[in-house]
Amino acid sequence: MHPTETHQLSIEFTNSSGPQVLEFKEDLKNWLIGSGEEAFVEGALDNLFEDPSYEITADEQFADLGGGLQSIFVYKYDLEHLERLRAELEKNFAHQIKCDITSLTTESWMEGWKESFKPITSARFYLYPPWIQDEKPANRIPIVIEPGMAFGTGQHATTVLCLEAIEQFFDKTTSLDRFLDVGTGTGILAIAAKKLGYNYVLGTDIDSDAIIASKENIVQNNCKMDLVQGSIPVDQAPFDLVVANIIFFVLKQIIGDLSAQVKPGALLILSGLLAEETREMEEYALKAGLRLEKEETRDDWAAQVYRKI
């Protein structure tokens, strides 16, 4: 079960005019990413409940360049985590931001975005939230996903691109032994791999809220797999397929470690990339001993499939 309380850290910009402030906001967002906050919300909470595209990562650009800066919100179950984050923000960005923490019930927080979470049908899977009880397609593998506080509901293009790449790889391989999902979020990709028949599946995430969400979804889907709170696993390599749906800011820093997890000749799927970042990502990957095999884009986002050289 999810914790009963959800906590909100709001980050308000004290000076909201001038192009230099937009640059500062991007710097702050990158700082959040570097601190492990890979997903957060821009704009008022009221707009979150009206706009189904509320899930915004640090690489997405501020849309209204001519207006004032919207606040940033970080949501966590762990109040102490947010208090530590606020202290670090105030230490690093004093006089430029104002931070505040408030609490609300998890039930009310989750009710706000339920209408925006719709079932997704892919080549092999039917992804749906637990509150939708419609008849499921007979020719698809059902996966029930409740996101909680974690990233990865199937609604975002990067998650769909990853899922499709996993399905395409499944159609071409007979090696279904070991699967690694780095930055597992809700566990959706790891669960899909287990449903396809992988013998051993490991999901990792640095976010404790993601581990809570993925554990619950694993139980809901009657799957057996390992979860580790952390980034790249130690002493677990190699894997037949490795997936990392994170963001470019992080991927370029860990690409060498990701490559080390992949069996020679096996595949690494990367997503969380903007289409404009793919060529630079390819350069980092090549230096890590990976060759680009395939690339797909959707809604300005991209997924890349690399083979370990």
How should these model regions be labeled?
Residues M149, T153-D235:
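Conserved SAM/SAH cofactor-binding pocket of Class I
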Residues F73, D100, L202, D226, ...:
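A structural signal for isolated positions on well-ordered beta-strands in alpha/beta enzyme cores
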